[in-house]
């Protein structure tokens, strides 16, 4: 099968966690894909490709690691030109790369700025850069990985996810380690909506995907805390993202999709 017979997908942060499981879910389907596995370092990208090939030895799809640091405009440009020179278009962009940092580890300003740089600005610039390739697809799809922690509706009624009452006094106890992370994901939801409306008339389908609380490096710091939701295998989130790529959630364009056909409130 030649490359032109396949759908072309780029997943940022594809060498581990949800990105890795999304790619695995895609190459387990009957639809032939050529997946660009976005990674920060050549060795980690190649290792992830080999691991996926071992896990899914029989597949109509092909894999290729590609270097992309979403905090580096030159890296994003190099990634774009590599994809452009090889195939000339892109069918699916999955903005998956994300981090969660704590002020207690590196200082508040550094933690918040770096989280916004990766989780919001990085996704914005990746999308802006790759739109010309998406517009050359017959069925362009744009996905932003968000979080249940980003939802304003439940947070306006109760302190989610712990549901605890924070006692008076200062300093406050550590309730959860995700303040910067959740704020960036709320911002990312607006980025998703902006692109949904900007690209709708061009035929680009855009979603936010909220994969649930997964057993990944991102989830490790919250697992077991009071009020923490049950931990799901990362493969559950990967299958959800893959289902959006496959067209199962086309009726929910412009929304934040959850598993089991549900939609997350903004």
UniProtKB/Swiss-Prot annotation:
* Gene3D superfamilies, A to Z: NAD(P)-binding Rossmann-like Domain
Q: What does the record give as the active site?
A: 147 (proton donor), 181 (proton acceptor), 185 (lowers pka of active site tyr)
Q: Which Pfam families match?
A: adh_short
Q: What is this protein called?
A: Short-chain dehydrogenase/reductase tropE
Kindly list the biological process annotations in GO that this record carries.
Answer: secondary metabolic process
Q: Cite the entry's keywords alphabetically.
A: NADP, Oxidoreductase
**What does it do?**
Short-chain dehydrogenase/reductase; part of the gene cluster that mediates the biosynthesis of the tropolone class of fungal maleic anhydrides. The pathway begins with the synthesis of 3-methylorcinaldehyde by the non-reducing polyketide synthase (PKS) tropA. 3-methylorcinaldehyde is the substrate for the FAD-dependent monooxygenase tropB to yield a dearomatized hydroxycyclohexadione. The 2-oxoglutarate-dependent dioxygenase tropC then performs the oxidative ring expansion to provide the first tropolone metabolite stipitaldehyde.
Instruction: Report residues binding NADP(+).
Output: 18, 69, 96, 181, 185, 216
Metabolic or biological pathway, per its Swiss-Prot or TrEMBL entry: Secondary metabolite biosynthesis
Effect of disrupting the coding gene: Blocks the synthesis of tropolone class of fungal maleic anhydrides downstream of stipitacetal.
> Which domain of life does this protein belong to?
Eukaryota
Read off the InterPro entries from this record: Fungal_SecMetab_SDRs, NAD(P)-bd_dom_sf, SDR_fam
- Mind naming one GO cellular-component term on file for this protein? cytoplasm
> Which Enzyme Commission number(s) are on file for it?
1.1.1.-
Q: What organism does the UniProt record list as the source?
A: Talaromyces stipitatus (strain ATCC 10500 / CBS 375.48 / QM 6759 / NRRL 1006) (Penicillium stipitatum)
Q: Does the keyword Oxidoreductase apply?
A: yes
Family designation: Belongs to the short-chain dehydrogenases/reductases (SDR) family.
């Amino acid at each position: 099968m030649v490359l032109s017979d396949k759908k072309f997908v780029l997943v940022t942060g594809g060498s581990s966690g949800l990105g890795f499981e999304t790619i695995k879910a895609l190459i387990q389907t009957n639809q032939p894909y050529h997946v660009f596995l976005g990674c920060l370092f050549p060795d980690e990208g190649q290792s992830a490709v080999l691991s996926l090939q071992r896990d899914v030895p029989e597949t109509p799809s092909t894999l290729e690691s590609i270097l992309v640091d979403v905090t580096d405009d030159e890296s994003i440009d190099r990634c774009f030109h590599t994809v452009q020179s090889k195939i000339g278009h892109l069918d699916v962009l999955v903005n998956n790369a994300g981090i969660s940092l704590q002020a207690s580890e590196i200082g508040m300003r550094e933690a918040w700025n770096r989280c916004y740089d990766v989780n919001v600005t990085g996704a914005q610039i990746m999308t802006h850069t790759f739109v010309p390739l998406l517009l050359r697809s017959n069925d362009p799809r744009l996905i932003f990985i968000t979080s249940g922690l980003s939802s304003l509706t439940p947070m306006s009624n109760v302190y989610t996810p712990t549901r605890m009452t924070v006692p008076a006094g200062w300093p406050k106890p550590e309730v959860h380690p995700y303040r910067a992370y959740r704020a960036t994901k709320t911002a990312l939801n607006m980025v998703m909506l902006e692109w949904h409306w900007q690209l709708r008339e061009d035929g680009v389908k855009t979603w936010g995907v909220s994969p649930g609380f997964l057993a990944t490096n991102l989830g490790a710091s919250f697992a077991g805390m009071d009020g923490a939701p049950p931990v799901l295998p990362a493969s559950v989130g990967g299958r959800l993202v893959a289902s959006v790529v496959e067209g199962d959630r086309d009726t929910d364009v412009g929304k934040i999709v959850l598993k089991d056909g549900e939609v997350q409130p903004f």
